[in-house]
Every structure is written in C-alpha cells, then in structure tokens.
C-alpha cells in the first residue's frame, strides 16, 4: 500500500468506527480462504461487514472515535466486524465462532462502551432491533384487537337477539 492509499484507508476506517453501532475484534489465524469468504457472506447477509486491516492502521483510525478503548486488542492477525445495528455484528461473529475454532473473539465496542469477549458474547444473546420492534408492535396491537372485540361484542349480541326474535315471529 502506498502512503496515499493508507491515508484513504485510515480515513475510511475512521468513519466506520464513528458510524457503526458495534465493532467486534477477533483473531482469525489459521482460517482458510473458504472459511473467511463464508464468514464475510454471512455477515453481509445480516447487514454487517468484515474487514482485515493492518493493526497499525486500525489503531490510527481509532484515534478520536468513541471506540478508541479497543486499540489494545489489535495484536496478531485481527479482523474487524461491524454493523449499524448494535446486535448484528456480535451475533454473527459469535454464531460463526461456535462452528469455527479459528475465529477467536477478543472484544469489541458499542458506542463508548468497551467490551471484552464475554461482553460481546452476552450482547450476541440479545434480540436485534428489528426483533424488538416486532415484539413491541405485537404488544401494542394485542390490546387494540381486544378492545375492538369488546366494542363489537355488544353489537353482535344485539344482532343475534334481533335475529332470534325475527325467527320466533316467523315461526308463530
């Protein structure tokens, strides 16, 4: 990489660290190209990204961001997984690490909070924002459905009473 390319890469990575909902740092030593491509495609499908960066450039890119506390994690062969949703990157990384022992989670960051490996693991167990929105919407809709049923019940009962009277009059 030439100096201009490095500068551009650091600027791009700095924007990533500033804009991401969460960042996960992991070792990938010994992982095959096929495994890394599979990992990248799973992360992309979930709405995240995986990058491999030189540790020195990643540390420079971290300066001036909320995630600056994770700069000590960049030792050895490290990768960066990030997403706008705070739950997506940790969830995909932890799911992939369960089936692949070559991916070792070192830690991460969510906003100003620096996470160790256990913190990333516990963050991965939380439901995503979309799942939480769906649950909240379901909780909001349930009472409305019940209220509509209660309001409509007297009218339907009244209609049944009129229908019964009409049938009684016809029979008589």
Swiss-Prot record:
Keyword annotations: Ribonucleoprotein, Ribosomal protein, RNA-binding, rRNA-binding
Any single GO CC term annotated in Swiss-Prot or TrEMBL for this entry: ribosome
GO molecular function, one term: large ribosomal subunit rRNA binding
Family as reported in the entry's similarity comment: Belongs to the universal ribosomal protein uL10 family.
Subunit structure: Part of the ribosomal stalk of the 50S ribosomal subunit. The N-terminus interacts with L11 and the large rRNA to form the base of the stalk. The C-terminus forms an elongated spine to which L12 dimers bind in a sequential fashion forming a multimeric L10(L12)X complex.
PANTHER family cross-referenced by the UniProt entry: 39S RIBOSOMAL PROTEIN L10, MITOCHONDRIAL (PTHR11560)
Protein name: Large ribosomal subunit protein uL10
């Amino acid at each position: 990489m030439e100096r201009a390319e490095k500068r551009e890469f650091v600027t791009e990575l700095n924007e990533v660290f500033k804009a991401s909902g969460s960042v996960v740092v992991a070792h990938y030593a010994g992982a095959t190209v096929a495994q890394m491509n599979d990992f990248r495609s799973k992360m992309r499908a979930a709405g995240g990204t995986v990058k491999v960066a030189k540790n020195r450039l990643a540390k420079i890119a971290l300066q001036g961001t909320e995630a600056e506390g994770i700069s000590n994690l960049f030792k050895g062969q490290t990768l960066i997984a990030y997403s706008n949703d705070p739950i997506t990157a940790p969830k995909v990384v932890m799911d992939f690490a369960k089936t692949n022992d070559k991916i070792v989670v070192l830690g991460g960051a969510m906003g100003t909070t620096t996470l160790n490996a256990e913190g990333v693991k516990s963050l991965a167990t939380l439901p995503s924002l979309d799942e939480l929105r769906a649950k909240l919407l379901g909780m909001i809709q349930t009472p409305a459905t019940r209220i509509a049923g209660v309001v409509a019940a007297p009218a339907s009962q009244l209609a049944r009473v009129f229908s019964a009277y009409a049938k009684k009059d016809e029979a008589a």
